[in-house]
Amino acid sequence: MRQETQKIMSAFLKGEKASAQRTNTDGNTVWLHGNKIAHRQQDTYDHGLVQFTLAGWPTVTTRERINGMLDVFGYSDFGVIQKNLNQYLVYKGKKVRSVDDREVISLAELDHLRDEMKNSRNTLLV
């Protein structure tokens, strides 16, 4: 994880302000180059109410920031990858489903997917 990502996402986890070269947070929202890529309901520290998006920019940097957030929030078994110019949500390195570059995904949805994957022998793989 890049130092900038670690700094910003650790502050976001704690609900604190932080700024770096390309990314900043007010503790409730994370912006990359001015685009909102993560948000939590104000004054709420329930991880299920945290949401993230590629904000229309499926770049290496956007995916790295999102994956860093997932790691800091304890969701390191999930990630967002690109394959053949398509974005995918992965669980333990396996594609779960495609992701639209403007789609908003919540950590609550990841909790649900994790439970489904653990409780089912059928895979949800794309």
What spans do the regions from the language model cover?
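Terminal leader/tail segments of proteins
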Residues: 1-126
